[in-house]
Amino acid sequence: MAKYDKADLERRMKGAVESLRGDLSGLRTGRANTALLDPIVVEVYGSHMPLAQVATVSAPEPRLLSVQVWDKSNVTPVEKAIRSAGLGLNPISDGNTLRLPIPDLTEERRKELAKLASKYAENARIAIRNVRRDGMDALKADESKKEISEDERKRAETDLQKLTDDIIKQADEAAAAKEKEILGK
């Protein structure tokens, strides 16, 4: 069993929150957000490449994304990848540029997205609690090896619980902000 390392546990917990923020940024809110296209992979030159490696994505207007494809021969594969991504976007081709108007979200779709944001947050909370459990196990192992006293273990457990609560609060705040943005409240 690994020795108790609070800095490593904190880094892993914060990693779960950053992962959550990344997942949340990919949820469509009715406003143009370049992160919406981050997960798209395009089949070009006989391999699969992230969209960011074949084009520049920008948001020139609040409800419009612009995808500037660097190589004209890749416009069709990029358009196909965007259409098949399941984001409900219909690219309009204009030379090397694809314009993506962001349609309004239906109330039903907003609720689905809010539920998805909650699910992402719950997954992050579970990951954070698993890291806490690893820390608690390491503390108990250190105590059983007589590397720390019972009082030191209890102090460290209290510390770890406070850290866990703080990090979970950050995850909940990120999810609540995204849900508010999605539901337009």
UniProtKB/Swiss-Prot annotation:
Protein name as catalogued: Ribosome-recycling factor
GO molecular function: ribosomal large subunit binding
GO annotation, biological process: cytoplasmic translational termination
GO (cellular component) term, any one: cytosol
SUPFAM superfamilies found in the cross-reference section: Ribosome recycling factor, RRF (SSF55194)
Purpose: Responsible for the release of ribosomes from messenger RNA at the termination of protein biosynthesis. May increase the efficiency of translation by recycling ribosomes from one round of translation to another.
InterPro entries on file: Ribosome_recyc_fac (IPR002661), Ribosome_recyc_fac_dom (IPR023584), RRF_sf (IPR036191)
NCBIfam families in the cross-refs: frr
Organism: Novosphingobium aromaticivorans (strain ATCC 700278 / DSM 12444 / CCUG 56034 / CIP 105152 / NBRC 16084 / F199)
Similarity field: Belongs to the RRF family.
Record has Protein biosynthesis as a keyword: yes
Annotated localization: Cytoplasm
Key words, A-Z: Cytoplasm, Protein biosynthesis
Superkingdom to which the source organism belongs: Bacteria
